[in-house]
C-alpha cells in the first residue's frame, strides 16, 4: 500500500509540476536552435534537446526530497542536462577530439554552474566550423541565471566543484583517446582517482562519475533554503557512487545494441553476463540504503523509480532486453509493480 501511494504521489507531482516545467524549457530552447546556420550543428543541437527530455525524467528522482523547490529545481536540472547532452552529441559526432577542444567546450559547464568568474570563452575555437552561432553560450547563460537563484548554493559549491572537475576530466579522457588506447586510458584514470571506493571495479568508478546524477542531486538540494552541510553530505553519499552506478548500468542496458553497432563506450560491456549486473544493482541499492538519514525512504523511492524509468523505456522490451527487464524488475524488490505501473501511465500520456 505504501508503494502504491508513493507511486501515485510521484505520478501526480510529475504530471502537475515537473512535466510543465520541462516542456516550457524545451520549447524555449528549441527556439534558440533556429539561430544555428550550419545544418549539421543544428541537427545535433535538436537531437540533443530531444534526448534531454528523457534526461529530465531521470533527473526527476532528485526532486523527491523534502523542501525541494520543484519548479526551480526542474528548470535548473533541465538547463544543465541540455548542455551535457549537447556536448556529448558534439563529441560523438566530431572528429576533432583533441584535448584543447574538449577542455574548452567542457569548461562551459563550470561557467553554467557559476564556478568561475571569467568572461565566457569562444568554446568552439578548435571546432571545424569555429562557431555554433552562440547557441552553447545561450545555454550556459540560461543555466547560470537559474543557478544564481539557488538559495543554498554556497552549501553545495565545494562539492559541486569537485564533482564537475572529475566529470570534465573523465570526458576529456574518454573522448580524446583513440579506440586502441581508450580502455587503457580509462583504467589508468579510474585507478588514479577511484582509490576511495575499493568495492568498485575501475569501470564502475567511471560509471559513477559519468552518471553526473550526484551533480543533479546537489543542484536540486540547493533549492532548499534550509539545507545544511550535513544533510547535503548524507544524501550525496547515498547517490555517489551507488545510485550513480545503477543509473549507468540501466542506461547501458537500453543502449547496449546501439552502442555495440556504433562502437560507443558502454560500461555494461565489461560485465560477464546479465546475472552479474543484476547482482551489482542489488549490491548498489543495499549500499545506498545503508545511510539511515531522515530522507531514507525518499532515497529508496528514488532508486526504485530510477529502475522503473528504464524498465518501462520502449527499448527495454526489444528482443533479449525483455528478459533483462524482468530480471531488473525482480532486483528492484517489493513495490516495483506499482512504480512501473505509474511510469507506464505517464508514458501513455506522453509525459515521460
Task: Go through the PLM ranges and name each one.
Residues 68-72, 90-97:
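Alpha-helix boundary/capping segments in eukaryotic regulatory proteins
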Residues 308-352:
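Acidic, carboxylate-rich catalytic segments that either coordinate divalent cations
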Residues 98-110, 266-267:
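Post-HEXXH active-site segment of zinc metalloproteases
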Residues 231-306:
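Active-site/pore-lining binding-face segments in mid-to-C-terminal subdomains
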Residues 1-11:
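Extreme N-terminal leader/anchor segments
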Residues 80-94, 247-258:
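Acidic (Asp/Glu-rich) catalytic motifs at the cytosolic membrane interface
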Residues 63-64:
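Internal amphipathic alpha-helical repeat/solenoid segments
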Residues 19-60, 73-74, 105-253, 257, ...:
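All-alpha helical catalytic cores of prenyl diphosphate-utilizing isoprenoid enzymes
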